[in-house]
Amino acid sequence: MSTEPTAGTIVLIHGFWVTPRSWEHWIARYESRGYRVIAPAYPGFEVEVEALNADPSPIEALTVPAIVDHLSAVVEEVDSPPILMGHSAGGAFVQLLLDRGYGSAGVAINSAPTEGVAVVPLSQVRAAFPVLKNPANRHRAVGFTHDQWHYAFTNTFSEEESLALYERYHVPASGSIFWGSALANIHPGKDDTYVDYHNDDRAPLLFISGSEDHLMPPKIQRSNAKHYKSNTITEVKEYEGRAHLLPAQDGWQEVADYALEWAEGHAESR
């Protein structure tokens, strides 16, 4: 078992098209506050960004159950329930983990939706088009060009900033998972991203949304939050002028501090 620092543990879960490297600023900030910070990689993502771009075959093999089982195993190794934070697809995985009973509080940042959230803004269609335009992408790892990345992730960043972050963070994403998510609401039965929206035992959950996010716009965050009908705490916080890659955008410190303060306050009430 792990040795727990006085301040506790925070688990940061990355999304698609990036790796744990995308949390580098938040890791340093939270560690400076006395927290143990774990930023687990998806199965096969234990290598660097450059290696995944050179050989994306581990990405092609990804499944949602494999990712969530892996994350569950990571969280189970922590001595007391950690704070869970996730960005994009990582936000959906935070919701799935909370539904399984893990975590003292959860923060979902520009989160991908869980099953049943059927809102599809036009900006999301355009942002996801590189993956969805070709059904053959269901069996591939699909990357973005820089122009596509700039629209989907960094539309409020300068061109220079966007390119630097593209080169530092970008990796292909699983076409299979993305297609599965797109079709989830028309398939019968429970999908891989199913959660029990009436689960009264779930830890408090905060959705953080960037007002200018093209890939997972605020409308999705609000709709996802409204799906929860349990007696547990579910709140939404929106930041003006923020894009999808909120954890790396100028002013990220304000968001990181708010997320932590909210989680600390609501975790203590459990």
What are these regions (language model features)?
Residues 15-18, 88, 211-212:
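Active-site glycine-rich loops that stabilize anionic/oxyanionic intermediates
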Residues 31-53:
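Conserved alpha/beta-hydrolase
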Residues 83-117:
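Conserved hydrolase catalytic core segment
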Residues 103-139, 179-186:
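Flexible "cap/lid" loop of the alpha/beta hydrolase fold
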Residues 124-172, 176:
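Helix-rich cap/lid subdomain of alpha/beta-hydrolase
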Residues 201, 207-209, 213:
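Short beta-strand/loop motif that positions the catalytic acidic residue
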Residues 214-223:
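Conserved alpha/beta-hydrolase "acid-adjacent" motif
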Residues 233-270:
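Catalytic active-site module of serine/aspartate enzymes centered on a nucleophile-bearing elbow/loop
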